[in-house]
Amino acid sequence: MNEIVLFDTSVLIDNQRTACHSERMADCPGRIRNSSVVLAELWRGATVAAERQFVKTLEESRPVLTPSEKNWLESGLILAAIRADKGFEPAKLRDLHFDVLIALTARSHGATLITSNRADFELIRRYRRFELEIW
């Protein structure tokens, strides 16, 4: 595992709902960082006060890594390649876009991305290598 760790939205939501990753997260080696894309996804889905407080606390607890201009441009190229290879509809590509940005941000910072969304991130990894751990 790399020195820097990013948790994907899936891991954070699973843990918030069921505490299923609490022990592993507490024992996680490396410096945990937040992704601005993950935080945006969490804010988008926060519908009650407890969820908003969770995101606010998370946002304030660690440094935030944000996709660069290069990451944004590269994400379009990756999604175009996925569309050409897999024939995905625009809605599926929109769903994948944030995941591609999260993966590219992790790659740019030499971070390990931890997710429970195996299918999407393993697909993305076929187009750009990055350190991935599945929980």
Where are these regions (language model features)?
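Alpha-helix capping/helix-boundary segments
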Residues: V11-L12, V38, N71, I102, ...
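Active-site neighborhoods of divalent-metal-dependent phosphate/nucleic-acid chemistry enzymes
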Residues: V64-S116
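Short, hinge-like loop/turn segments at secondary-structure boundaries
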Residues: A49-Q53, I82-R83, E131-I134
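Short, well-structured N-terminal submotif of metal-dependent ribonuclease cores
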Residues: M1-R62
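Histidine- and aromatic-rich ligand-binding microenvironments
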Residues: F7-D8, N34-S35, R94-L96, N117-R118, ...
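Residue-level signal for well-ordered alpha-helical positions
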Residues: T18-A19, G45, I78, I124-Y127
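Phosphate- and divalent-cation-binding pockets in alpha/beta enzyme and binding domains
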Residues: E41-L42, E74, L123
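Acidic, PIN/NYN-like endoribonuclease modules and their adjacent C-terminal/linker elements
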Residues: N2-I4, A103, R107-W135
